[in-house]
Amino acid sequence: MTMERIKIFTRSFDLRLYLNSKGLFDKLGVPVVRLTDQSADGYFHTMLKDTECDIAVNIDEDAFLTDPDAMFRLIDYVVENGYANAGCPDGGGFCPRAANPIVTNPFFNILNLKLIRTRYDRKAIRDFNYKEHKEEMIKHFPNERLETKYDFDRTEQEPYYPFFLWLAYNFRTLYLPSQRHEDGMTTILKDLEGHTLCLHTWFARFYTTPTWLVRFVDSKRGIQKKRIDAVIDQAYSIRGMERPSFGLTDRLSFIVNKIIRWIIKVPQRISRWPYKLRKKLRHRFHPDQTD
């Protein structure tokens, strides 16, 4: 495998958090791409359009790489064994969710873009009827990954569900084991040999939101920054690296960047309201129909 055919992609909203995550992989000799202002499903199509990349490492800005060597070994394993995707089940493992385990949560994925492109079709993804194939797909799911609550009937948990359901039906997915961090929230993602690949903290959207505002919106999420910072420190300690420090100019750029991101994000959110409303009405009055 040639290194230049691998790229690391991150869908990012918070520049400060992104730079903390990027600091753990930006010197690996692999091109790094920050994707901003893209939808939760659209950025996978952006990766697939990048014909200079055969293997995409998709990592969230609140996921922190702890073992690059394990990551590269996993890439080799994925390619050599004909997998299209490797990642953490969205249910049944130690994500703070109980959703559909056939879908891999995109906080960390190895995506074999070269293989996926052999059948890639956006219309086929939209038209894929999971309910018709559900029982068959469940039979092929590794039961050893079902350690906690899950729900194979969930099909609309997130916008990226259609992509990953289609992917799991048409190609092989490697489902990785996970553990719960001692903080009670962070997911520790493992490879098949038990090495820790990354630490995913969740709730990145609350990282730089004032605590008083977070508590007003969601009283249970007011301590996220302190918890996430502790995990970032842990990841850098594991790697034997010094965490990035930011000066006044950096902090100003973070503020400007966030303002720009919100200016773009709000209209995007509003534009999807009619679609979400139609979707809710359709499933209320026609629950047997698929999207």
Question: Where are the regions that the model predicts?
Answer:
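C-terminal catalytic/acceptor-binding lobe
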Residues: I138-D291
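Long, low-complexity, intrinsically disordered polar/charged segments
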Residues: T2-Y18, K27, L74-I75, L115-T118, ...
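Short beta-strand-to-loop acidic/aromatic patch adjacent to the donor-nucleotide binding site
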Residues: C53-F64
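Short, high-confidence coil segments that cap the C-terminus of an alpha-helix
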Residues: C53, N81-A84, F171-R172
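N-terminal anchoring/stem segment of glycosyltransferases
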Residues: M1-D54
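Short beta-alpha junction loops
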Residues: D14, P89-G93, Q179-E182
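Conserved catalytic core of nucleotide-sugar-dependent glycosyltransferases
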Residues: F64, P68-Y161
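A structural signal for short, well-ordered beta-strand segments and their strand-loop junctions
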Residues: R34, N58, N85-P89, I110, ...
